[in-house]
Amino acid sequence: MSVEEEVFRIQKKMSKMASDGTGQDQALDLLKALQTLNINLDILTKTRIGMTVNELRKSSKDDEVIALAKTLIKNWKRFLASPAPTTPNNSSAKEGSSNNSSASKSTSAAKSSSSISGKDKSSSSSSSKDKEKKGSTSSSQTSFPSGGMTDAVRIKCREMLATALKIGEVPEGCGEPEEMAAELEDAIYSEFNNTDMKYKNRIRSRVANLKDPKNPGLRGNFMCGAVTAKQLAKMTPEEMASDEMKKLREKFVKEAINDAQLATVQGTKTDLLKCAKCKKRNCTYNQLQTRSADEPMTTFVMCNECGNRWKFC
């Protein structure tokens, strides 16, 4: 098994530990296994093991696990802070100079040195291209202003909220979407003090409601300050719903109440009332006092043929 495959295997186990808290007794052994592996910057980038170890450190209560996790993260950060190693160009230049000095002694040695330097130059150019690609990838991933934030999960959630706030036109005089998104994410994080599933579900519900094209009022009220970040962080789905959805829910509630009233009271059959839907005179009606005592009673009618219901006073 290669180093990269071994790191992937350990990363999966640690991710499960950090998410559901199971298997914490194996955390120390896994960290020690990582300490023995020869992990380079390429493996760190592909496996994202650094983020996983950091999440495990936050969720663990074992001092030894926390200390070893900090040590690993500190060692891996040196890959980012260390200066670029000597490129093959420098070594090829030295080899070229030594070969040039000995060129007068042997023509064949000069030819071999020139071929070696040519290979070194091609390898150095390919390595520089790879570094440029990695640099462009890392810069695109960190395009969102983190504001000192180091938690990758929280940064990603802020990006999602900012994207939702940018939908449609931003009213003049309102805050910047990135700043408003950071403020909202911070308010949600303060509710849970971690990035578990409850935190992520809260983020998803805010993103869905802010992106809803039928609910521009919520987005506008938040951007203009009518609704604060703390209020939006605690709102229920009913409170975030659009006016149209609130009216629809109110209508459904009233209809359900009426249906329940008709179902609980045994009606009186009559052929005096005609159904407007099927035109037949096979109905059952009830009379209930739905308003004040001095007002006439409301008659609820149900057609026994087609199930159509209506009421009148």
Curated annotation (Swiss-Prot):
<dbReference type="Pfam" id="PF01096">
    <property type="entry name" value="Zn_ribbon_TFIIS"/>
</dbReference>
<dbReference type="InterPro" id="IPR017923">
    <property type="entry name" value="TFIIS_N"/>
</dbReference>
<comment type="similarity">
    <text>Belongs to the TFS-II family.</text>
</comment>
<feature type="compositionally biased region" description="Low complexity">
    <location>
        <begin position="91"/>
        <end position="117"/>
    </location>
</feature>
<dbReference type="GO" id="GO:0006368">
    <property type="term" value="P:transcription elongation by RNA polymerase II"/>
</dbReference>
<keyword id="KW-0862">Zinc</keyword>
<keyword id="KW-0539">Nucleus</keyword>
<dbReference type="InterPro" id="IPR003618">
    <property type="entry name" value="TFIIS_cen_dom"/>
</dbReference>
<feature type="region of interest" description="Disordered">
    <location>
        <begin position="83"/>
        <end position="150"/>
    </location>
</feature>
<feature type="compositionally biased region" description="Basic and acidic residues">
    <location>
        <begin position="118"/>
        <end position="135"/>
    </location>
</feature>
<dbReference type="InterPro" id="IPR001222">
    <property type="entry name" value="Znf_TFIIS"/>
</dbReference>
<dbReference type="GO" id="GO:0008270">
    <property type="term" value="F:zinc ion binding"/>
</dbReference>
<dbReference type="Pfam" id="PF07500">
    <property type="entry name" value="TFIIS_M"/>
</dbReference>
<feature type="compositionally biased region" description="Low complexity">
    <location>
        <begin position="136"/>
        <end position="148"/>
    </location>
</feature>
<protein>
    <recommendedName>
        <fullName>Transcription elongation factor S-II</fullName>
    </recommendedName>
</protein>
<keyword id="KW-0804">Transcription</keyword>
<keyword id="KW-0238">DNA-binding</keyword>
<feature type="binding site">
    <location>
        <position position="278"/>
    </location>
    <ligand>
        <name>Zn(2+)</name>
    </ligand>
</feature>
<feature type="binding site">
    <location>
        <position position="275"/>
    </location>
    <ligand>
        <name>Zn(2+)</name>
    </ligand>
</feature>
<feature type="domain" description="TFIIS N-terminal">
    <location>
        <begin position="5"/>
        <end position="83"/>
    </location>
</feature>
<dbReference type="GO" id="GO:0005634">
    <property type="term" value="C:nucleus"/>
</dbReference>
<keyword id="KW-0805">Transcription regulation</keyword>
<dbReference type="InterPro" id="IPR036575">
    <property type="entry name" value="TFIIS_cen_dom_sf"/>
</dbReference>
<keyword id="KW-0863">Zinc-finger</keyword>
<dbReference type="GO" id="GO:0006357">
    <property type="term" value="P:regulation of transcription by RNA polymerase II"/>
</dbReference>
<dbReference type="InterPro" id="IPR035100">
    <property type="entry name" value="TF_IIS-typ"/>
</dbReference>
<dbReference type="InterPro" id="IPR006289">
    <property type="entry name" value="TFSII"/>
</dbReference>
<keyword id="KW-0479">Metal-binding</keyword>
<feature type="domain" description="TFIIS central">
    <location>
        <begin position="153"/>
        <end position="268"/>
    </location>
</feature>
<dbReference type="InterPro" id="IPR003617">
    <property type="entry name" value="TFIIS/CRSP70_N_sub"/>
</dbReference>
<comment type="function">
    <text>Necessary for efficient RNA polymerase II transcription elongation past template-encoded arresting sites. The arresting sites in DNA have the property of trapping a certain fraction of elongating RNA polymerases that pass through, resulting in locked ternary complexes. Cleavage of the nascent transcript by S-II allows the resumption of elongation from the new 3'-terminus.</text>
</comment>
<feature type="zinc finger region" description="TFIIS-type">
    <location>
        <begin position="271"/>
        <end position="311"/>
    </location>
</feature>
<feature type="binding site">
    <location>
        <position position="303"/>
    </location>
    <ligand>
        <name>Zn(2+)</name>
    </ligand>
</feature>
<feature type="binding site">
    <location>
        <position position="306"/>
    </location>
    <ligand>
        <name>Zn(2+)</name>
    </ligand>
</feature>
<dbReference type="InterPro" id="IPR035441">
    <property type="entry name" value="TFIIS/LEDGF_dom_sf"/>
</dbReference>
<dbReference type="GO" id="GO:0003677">
    <property type="term" value="F:DNA binding"/>
</dbReference>
<dbReference type="Pfam" id="PF08711">
    <property type="entry name" value="Med26"/>
</dbReference>
